[in-house]
Design a protein with these regions (language model features):
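A general, composition-driven signal for non-globular sequence regions
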Residues: 1, 7, 24-26, 35-46
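Structural signature for solvent-exposed beta-strand/loop edge elements and short helix-capping sites
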Residues: 32-210
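Gram-negative bacterial Sec-dependent N-terminal signal peptides
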Residues: 2-30
Length: 210
């Protein structure tokens, strides 16, 4: 395996905050379900399964980058990094960004010289310990708490809930508004029921949708 490049940078806001606070995500609500493993799904063991209604649960994997003493620091790691004379940077190959409890994975990430925006492409996954959001294209405005994400799927770990949405925005901490969206508590690949609506509001702390 070739050498991977790592770096830390100070930024003003959290990555998940940038992705969910006042953000808009573009996706197809009725797209095909993602594979269970892509949604951080783990099956119960034989002994555990006997006492459970569902076949498994959603579990966030371990962080790939270590935590920094200063939670404002943005850590970067990638297989290849190209720096331009004007300060722009292009990261390629299994890119990982982490700040505080938020971690982002992508195949390619572009950082402008001012580091106020992140443009990511390819197999994107954003996790913060409570939620997972996946897509193929994302634009994060780090200093404005705004972002857009294409082809999005989401998981709320503790609520055993997953879904898709045309537009997803966070209206308050742990509260989300999804437009042209669906959600279900069924196991991945088993949509015995799902709610499909032009407007769904989710409360992550309470675990309900309206």
């Amino acid at each position: 395996m070739g050498k991977r490049f790592s770096r830390t940078l100070p930024v003003a806001h959290t990555l998940m905050g940038s992705l969910l606070a006042g953000a808009s995500f573009t996706a197809v609500a009725q797209a095909q379900d993602m594979p269970a493993e892509a949604l951080d799904w783990q099956a119960w063991g034989e002994e555990e399964a006997a006492n459970q209604l569902c076949r498994g649960r959603y579990v966030m994997p371990s962080y790939r980058l270590p935590a920094q003493e200063n939670p404002e620091i943005l850590s970067l790691e990638a297989s290849e990094v190209d720096y331009a004379a004007n300060g722009e940077a292009l990261l390629r190959g299994d890119v990982v960004l982490r700040r505080g409890n938020e971690e982002v994975e992508a195949e390619r990430v572009f950082l402008p010289a001012d580091r106020e925006q992140v443009d990511a492409e390819g197999n994107i996954a954003i996790r913060d310990g409570r939620a997972l959001v996946r897509g193929e294209q994302a634009m994060l405005r780090l200093n404005e708490d705004r972002a857009t994400l294409g082809n999005s799927h989401y998981v709320l770990y503790d609520q055993h809930l997953r879904g898709q949405a045309n537009q997803l925005e966070q209206t308050a901490e742990g509260e989300y508004r999804l437009q042209d969206a669906s959600f279900t508590t069924c196991d991945p690949g088993a949509n015995s029921w799902q709610l499909v609506s032009s407007d769904i509001r989710l409360n992550q702390a309470e675990g309900f949708g309206t």
